[in-house]
UniProtKB/Swiss-Prot annotation:
Disulfide bonds: none annotated. One of its GO terms (cellular component) is cytosol. Required for insertion of 4Fe-4S clusters for at least IspG. This is Iron-sulfur cluster insertion protein ErpA. Belongs to the HesB/IscA family. PANTHER family: IRON-SULFUR CLUSTER ASSEMBLY 2 HOMOLOG, MITOCHONDRIAL. The gene is erpA. Keywords: Iron, Iron-sulfur, Metal-binding. It comes from the Bacteria. Binds 1 iron-sulfur cluster per subunit. GO terms for biological process: iron-sulfur cluster assembly. GO terms for molecular function: 2 iron, 2 sulfur cluster binding; 4 iron, 4 sulfur cluster binding; iron ion binding.
Length: 113
């Protein structure tokens, strides 16, 4: 699949951090799963977890030999977004740069559409 057809991007910085974390866990089957749940101060919130499974209907995006997984329900809120990683004074975290979000909370962990 070419990048032009992928509805969600996985940044090099995020992929490299995932690669490091997988190496630390010594489990090459791990993949980063991004998902959306109800809650947070803006209505929806992003979640990230490591998962060994890819479920029916999940989309996978690969970068630098690691895989990002997203379920179809979450994907509809993430189309056009970029999963990225940052380290700063507020700590380190994965985040989504989401063009569909009409409002976001101050920390960027929740959003509304």
């Amino acid at each position: 699949m070419s990048d032009a057809n992928v509805p969600l991007s996985f940044s090099d910085v995020a992929a490299n951090k995932v690669k490091t974390l997988i190496a630390e866990e010594e489990n090459p089957e791990l993949k980063l799963r991004v998902y959306i749940t109800g809650g947070g101060c803006s209505g929806f919130q992003y979640g990230f977890t490591f998962d060994e499974k890819v479920n029916d209907g999940d989309m996978t995006i690969e970068n630098s030999g690691v895989t990002l997984v997203v379920d179809p329900m979450s994907l509809q809120y993430l189309v056009g977004g970029i999963v990225d990683y940052t380290e700063g004074l507020e700590g380190s975290r994965f985040f989504v740069n989401n063009p569909n979000a009409t409002t976001t909370c101050g920390c960027g962990a929740s959003f509304s559409v």
